[in-house]
Amino acid sequence: MSMVSEFKKFALKGNVMDLAVGVIIGGAFATITKSLVEDVIMPIVAFIAGGEINFKNMFLILGDTPEGVVMTYDALKAAGVPVLAYGNFITVLINFLILAFIIFMMVKMVNRLRRADEVVEKIAGPSEEVQLLREISAKLGNINK
């Protein structure tokens, strides 16, 4: 089998295609989550806290600062000053927690739907094949008596 045909067989398997779709949707979903945190949640947190909270400007300078450099994260990074950006980490952590919670809720909903389908199957009773076999068994039982 050639390398190209082997790759085609691998790439066209259902699981690989499902994974590719999941990765693409996951990337888009991460962008939505980032916007939710930065554009919706953080302004509400800032309002409740009584002022503007900009986590990006929460950092710790680890080295010497050159003369005339503005003390903002972007300016310090541009000047090559080592900076511990714990504020950015907080933002990324909030993004992750929201994303993890949403995915947890989605999995929980899918599991609930699967259980509901299983209950419907159990309530529906035996399949036609089982009913037919029971009828045949009953008739054979009557013949043998």
From Swiss-Prot:
Protein name per its UniProtKB record: Large-conductance mechanosensitive channel
Domain of life: Bacteria
SUPFAM superfamilies: Gated mechanosensitive channel
Keywords: Cell inner membrane, Cell membrane, Ion channel, Ion transport, Membrane, Transmembrane, Transmembrane helix, Transport
A cellular component annotation (GO) from this entry: plasma membrane
Keyword Membrane: yes
Organism annotation: Psychrobacter arcticus (strain DSM 17307 / VKM B-2377 / 273-4)
Family: Belongs to the MscL family.
Gene: mscL
PANTHER family: LARGE-CONDUCTANCE MECHANOSENSITIVE CHANNEL, MECHANOSENSITIVE CHANNEL MSCL
Membrane topology: Multi-pass membrane protein
Protein function: Channel that opens in response to stretch forces in the membrane lipid bilayer. May participate in the regulation of osmotic pressure changes within the cell.
